[in-house]
Design a protein with these regions (language model features):
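Condensing-enzyme catalytic core mediating Claisen C-C bond formation in acyl metabolism
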Residues: 1-25, 139, 224-290, 294, ...
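N-terminal extracellular/periplasmic Venus flytrap/periplasmic-binding protein-like
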Residues: 11-12, 23-27, 31-32, 40, ...
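Conserved beta-ketoacyl condensing-enzyme motif
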Residues: 23-89, 93-110, 114-133, 199-214, ...
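Conserved catalytic cysteine-centered active-site region
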Residues: 55-109, 152-156, 222-248, 329-356, ...
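Active-site-proximal alpha-helical scaffold in enzymes
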Residues: 86-116, 165-194, 255-262, 327, ...
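Flexible glycine-/small-residue-enriched beta->alpha junction loops
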Residues: 109-163
Length: 394
């Protein structure tokens, strides 16, 4: 079987809700990181066969946001683009589809990733098309409706996190401690400049100047266990899930060149990792946070590899309760999981997160000379995705 490489995995820094990245659309963020991938790899845009980009909150963004981003990045008009919406798994699914395309000989060089501007998700007037004859109309927040609500069970993703906490016995204290550790690890990584090689500057024009945005701004350096313990339950009376032990609402983008080994050699590209395989699975929507357990187990069985052989995991921290339950069910040491913090600290721009955690994973594997890593996410509506990668430099 063909070897498929990951070349120049890069991301923007993650922006906080309605903060620094808010003036930019998802496609502008996507264009920024795609341009950087091409510049770093020194690959001619005309050599790209196709593009897959995740984007979840598409209301009002116009047709095919992936193509918009590609054209803004200077990709030739004859290169086709596909926008992927697999909720939180979109960015990683986009990379998986790029991998599939190469194995199916539908291309040899594919640009893939994800982008999201949660700050720019619009409000909707659902019944305005036919007019309001009497009474008040309701504004619907598309961010909540399309990004954070289970359409099967008709409740917030936070309730699925409460369901997991109850079923798997994850206490409020455990969740707050996990969230605190996520912040500490992210702060340490930021201070040690461990994210520098994976982050590309986003240039933002203001009335007075042009700002270069290069640091994750969702990380809270002043978080304490005491502050976390004082937060009220966000989704359920007497619940355990709070704003402090859940992921953020964020903006950002990430992308990577997915390339056949032959083309890497032909164009002198430098792979950082090889994709060994991936899995996409379905689970009960009420416990969607457990998707990574099934996805990772399926992937390991498919690849004939023991979980003990995996050196590092990036398991998206949608909520502390589900991340802890996943780790416990898999029997994985926390020392291997999200070693530089996760979405609770760094943030969760939904359509970009899959590509973001893959980018972070690959760079950390290279830094540590780790052989195998797995990136995995739970997915709203009840799914899970996981990808196994191998260090190309050892």
């Amino acid at each position: 079987m063909k070897k498929v490489a990951l070349v120049s995995p890069l991301r923007t820094a993650v922006g906080s809700f309605n903060k620094t990245l808010a003036p930019l659309s998802a496609s502008e963020l996507g264009a920024t990181v795609m341009t950087a991938c091409l510049q770093q790899s020194k690959l001619e845009p005309s050599l790209i066969d196709q593009i897959y980009l995740g984007n979840v909150l598409q209301a009002g963004n116009g047709q095919n946001p992936a193509r918009q981003a590609a054209l803004k990045a200077g990709i030739p008009i004859d290169v086709p683009e596909t926008t992927i919406n697999t909720v939180c798994g979109s960015g990683l699914h986009a990379v998986a589809l790029a991998y599939n395309s190469i194995l199916a000989e539908q291309g040899n060089i594919v640009l893939a990733g994800g982008m999201e501007s949660m700050s720019n998700a619009p409000y909707l007037l659902r019944n305005a098309r036919n007019g309001y004859k009497l009474g008040n109309g309701e504004l619907v927040d598309s961010l909540v409706a399309d990004g954070l609500t289970c359409p099967i069970n008709h409740y917030h993703m936070g309730i699925t996190a409460e369901n997991v906490a109850e079923k798997y016995g994850i206490s409020r204290l455990e969740q707050d401690e996990f969230a605190y550790q996520s912040q500490l690890k992210a702060i340490e990584a930021k201070n040690k400049k461990l994210f520098e090689e994976q982050i590309v500057p986003v240039m933002i024009k203001t009335k007075k100047e042009t700002i270069s945005f290069t640091e994750d701004e969702h990380i809270r350096g002043n978080t304490t266990q005491e502050k976390l313990s004082q937060l009220k339950p966000a989704f359920k009376e007497n619940g355990t899930v709070t704003a402090g032990n859940a992921s953020g609402i964020n903006d950002g983008a990430a992308a990577v060149l997915v390339v056949s080994e032959d083309k890497c050699k032909e164009h002198a590209l430098k792979p950082l990792a090889y994709i060994k395989g991936y899995s996409l699975v379905g689970v009960d929507p009420a416990y969607m946070g457990m998707g990574p357990v099934k996805a990772i187990s399926t992937l390991l069985k498919q690849q004939g590899i023991s979980i003990d052989a995996i050196d590092l995991f990036e398991i998206n921290e949608a909520f502390a309760s589900q991340a802890l339950a996943v780790v416990k069910e898999l029997g994985v040491s926390l020392d291997k999981v999200n070693v530089n913090g996760g979405a609770i600290a760094i943030g969760h721009p939904v359509g970009a997160s899959g590509a973001r955690i893959l980018t972070t994973l690959v760079h950390e594997m290279v830094r540590r000379s780790s052989r195998y890593g797995i990136a995995s996410l739970c997915i709203g509506t009840g799914m899970g995705i996981a990808m196994l990668v191998e260090n190309a430099l050892i």
